[in-house]
Design a protein with these regions (language model features):
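Conserved phosphate-binding/catalytic region of the ribokinase-like
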Residues: 2-10, 15-26, 173, 226-329
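Active-site metal-binding loops of divalent metal-dependent hydrolases
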Residues: 33, 157, 186, 276
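Conserved beta-alpha-beta core of the PfkB/ribokinase-like small-molecule kinase fold
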Residues: 159-231, 247-248
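Glycine-rich phosphate/adenosyl-contacting loop at the front of the ribokinase-like
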Residues: 7-97
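Conserved N-terminal subdomain of the carbohydrate kinase-like
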Residues: 71-154
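Short, conserved phosphate/pyrophosphate- and ester-handling motifs at nucleotide-, phospho-/glycolipid
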Residues: 65, 216, 274
Length: 329
C-alpha cells in the first residue's frame, strides 16, 4: 500500500444532502447495551461516587448516527428492571427505534464500572454473567428489519457466548445476503473473554462478511497475529479504519493508506470515542449516498478527517452519548 500524508482540514461547509433510498433504515445495529457507572468525584467522607450512563458500543454508534439525522434501529436485550427501563428511555431519547430492543424477564441488565486514569483512559469491571445482552436468540433477530437497512453494524461482545454468538452470525449473514453494507468493531474487552486466543479466533470468524472494519492498533495486532491489514483484506474486508489513540487514525482503502493525525484535545474521558469515530464515518458514507464500489479515496479521507475531529472533541466530556458533539450535525 502507498502511504499518503494527510493533515486535518476543517471544511467550512459539509453537504447534508440526503439521498432518497428504498430502504427504511439507514443503520441497524445488534449487540450489547448496558449501564456504565463512571466516576463522579468523591463524597464528603472521601468515598468515590459513580453516576450511571447508557453504554454499549453498538448503541454509541447508533446514537452518533441518529444525532447526524439518520434513521436507526437497535436489536438487543435489557433486563425487566430499573436499569433496563433507563436504557430504553435513553434509546428513545436518542431518536433510535427501540421496537426491536426487548425486555428479558429471566436475566438482568448488564452493568459495567469504569475507572479513569489521569489521561482519561479506562479500565472496566463487568457484571454480565447473567446479563440480558448475552441471551439474544435467533428469534430476537428481525430479518425483515435488517433487509430494510442500508448498513448493518455489530461488535464482538455479542460473540463472547451462546446464544448471542449464533444469533449474531445469523444476523450478519442475513445482512450480507440482503446487500447491506456490513460494518464491524471488534472492541476487545479482556475481562469478557476466556483468553486472548479465543477472542482473536472468534473475532475473526465473521470477517468474510464484513465490508468496513474499525479497530485499534492493538486489536489489529491480536486478530491478524502481526500480519496487519493485509490479513483483513485477504479475509474479504474492503475498508479498514485503524485507530491509535492520541496519534490519530489510518484509513486503508483501495490499496492506499492515509494517516489522519489526532486533534489537540483536553481529554478527560475516552469512553465511546472509537464508537463515535465509526458512527461519524458511517454517517458521512451514508449521507454521501454511495456504495463502496463508487466511494472515492478522497471522500473516504474526508470522512475519516471528520471522524477524527468529532471523536477527539468527544473526549473533552464525560460519558459516551452525552459527549457526542453537535458539530456532527
Amino acid at each position: 500500500m502507498k502511504n499518503i500524508n494527510v493533515y486535518y482540514i476543517i471544511k467550512s461547509k459539509i453537504s447534508l444532502k440526503r439521498v432518497t433510498a428504498v430502504r427504511k433504515y439507514d443503520i441497524t445495529a445488534l449487540g450489547e447495551i448496558l449501564i456504565d457507572f463512571v466516576p463522579d468525584g468523591v463524597d464528603s467522607v472521601g468515598d468515590m461516587r459513580f453516576i450511571r450512563k447508557a453504554g454499549g458500543a453498538p448503541l454509541n454508534v447508533l446514537a452518533t448516527a441518529a444525532r447526524a439525522g439518520l434513521k436507526t434501529a437497535f436489536i438487543g436485550k435489557v433486563g425487566n428492571d430499573l436499569p433496563g427501563e433507563f436504557l430504553i428511555e435513553t434509546v428513545k431519547g436518542c431518536g433510535i427505534d427501540c421496537n426491536y430492543l426487548k425486555k428479558d424477564n429471566e436475566h438482568n441488565t448488564t452493568l459495567a464500572f469504569v475507572e479513569l486514569d489521569n489521561k482519561g483512559d479506562r479500565k472496566f469491571s463487568f457484571y454480565r454473567t447473567y446479563g440480558a445482552d448475552r441471551f439474544i436468540y435467533e428469534s430476537d433477530v428481525d430479518k425483515k428489519l435488517i433487509a430494510d437497512s442500508k448498513v448493518f453494524h455489530f461488535g464482538s461482545l455479542s460473540l463472547t457466548d451462546e446464544p448471542s454468538y449464533f444469533s449474531t452470525e445469523i444476523a450478519v449473514k442475513t445482512a450480507k445476503d440482503c446487500g447491506c453494507t456490513v460494518t464491524y468493531d471488534p472492541n476487545y474487552r479482556p475481562p469478557l473473554w476466556d483468553s486472548p486466543e479465543k477472542a482473536a479466533e472468534r473475532m475473526a470468524v465473521l470477517l468474510p462478511y464484513v465490508d468496513i472494519i474499525k479497530l485499534s492498533v492493538e486489536e489489529l495486532e491480536m486478530i491478524s497475529e502481526g500480519r496487519g491489514t493485509e490479513f483483513l483484506f485477504e479475509k474479504g474486508v474492503r475498508l479498514a479504519l485503524v485507530t491509535d489513540g492520541d496519534k490519530g487514525a489510518t484509513l486503508c482503502f483501495k490499496g492506499e493508506k492515509a494517516h489522519i493525525p489526532a486533534i489537540k484535545a483536553k481529554t478527560v474521558d475516552t469512553t465511546g470515542a472509537g464508537d463515535i469515530f465509526l458512527g461519524t464515518f458511517v454517517s458521512e458514507f451514508i449521507k454521501k449516498g454511495e456504495n463502496l464500489d463508487e466511494l472515492s479515496l478522497d471522500d473516504a479521507i474526508n470522512f475519516t478527517q471528520k471522524a477524527v475531529f468529532i471523536s477527539g472533541k468527544s473526549t473533552e466530556k464525560y460519558g459516551a452519548i452525552a459527549s457526542i458533539s453537535d458539530v456532527i450535525i
